[in-house]
Amino acid sequence: MRSNQDKALEVWLDSDLAPACLVGTLAHDRGQVRFRYDRNWLGQARAFALDPDLSLDDQPFFPKPELGNFGVFLDSSPDRWGQTLMKRREALQAKDEKRTPRTLYAWDFLIGVQDFTRQGALRFRLAGTDVFLGNEKMAAPPVTTLRELEAVAFQLSSRRIDDLDALRKWLTVLVAPGASLGGARPKANFTEADGTLWIGKFPARDDDRDVGAWEYVVHGLATKAGIDVPPASLVRLNNDFHTFCIQRFDRVKGARRFYASAMTLLRKEHSEGSSYLELAQFLRSNGDGARAGADLEQLFRRVAFNVAVGNRDDHLRNHGFVLGTNGWQLAPAFDVNPNIDKAEHVLNIDDADNRPSLQTVLSTAAFYGLTADRAAQVVEEVASAVDSWRDAARKAGIAAADVELTAGAFSAHSEYRA
């Protein structure tokens, strides 16, 4: 009997737009992944290509070997933090079973995610069954467990852990709520008192600054600047540093929203050399009808804000889109942080320049369908919101030395005001 690693999975679309529907089959056989649409899906009026590399054709599709899977399924899989949890669990299980640890690949990470917290609206189950993969009850524990989750995540963020009994206990607590999430920092899903799904982003053992508090500060500035961001909160639990909590935007009143990263929809393998103008072009070509113009202005506002606050780790997986009734909509902003370790943005501001400059942002106004006057107004609104960044940092309890250390991230804002 073959393991889950070598069985075909039914791929279901369960979004807020229509009843759940089987859309295809994703198979893994001897290291090779293939996908094929269900013929009933191909015949439906609402059918759409899940991924730019998966056209609506009745044929098998194979991903690029270097990726190991299609972008839309990679978006449903964990990034570095979730992968770290899974790798540590596999190493511990291998030790307990007196065997060599398996090397985990893209397929393993996909099937290792809990269904309840999986990003987006795709769900997976073994063919012939009616239970979706990953149905543990504690995939998103209640907010009352947040203190325990933070404490465990702090321990698991260590590069080396020698106490295997402690590791076993910690993984039992955190793998289910934490393994679905992207990014490199420790985090976990949890359920708020009103039933909404949230993410807690925790301090790491090697932190030398209050990363969570800074994300909260920038979140508040973003709200003032007219940036679309989900609700958020800041708590201090076991640590000198804070935990930043933010509501999941891919859930609406309990329903799932179909989400894809900019990396996937732009058919990219990496972000270097890419530009914000490519995101604008995607919205012009594939945006959701009546709101496409507003989304383009929101994207321009977001570029200006990222430059003003030094959010320079702005790679294509940190931008995304959710599917609307008539096309793609710009997803709310997420993972926006002042970055003191990068002098330039990952994405180019115009077609070639990734240096942080609000003047460069202004020069791109026409690509977003904005007049020069409207663009100047938007940038001024953003700059006015960011003017208070020092006061906001102090109110969040960030130490004065940390404020001065982070000032370089706001250099483009300072230059604009000079």
Q: Positions of the model-derived regions?
A:
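Phosphate/dinucleotide-binding and metal-coordinating scaffold of catalytic cores
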Residues: 1-316, 320-418
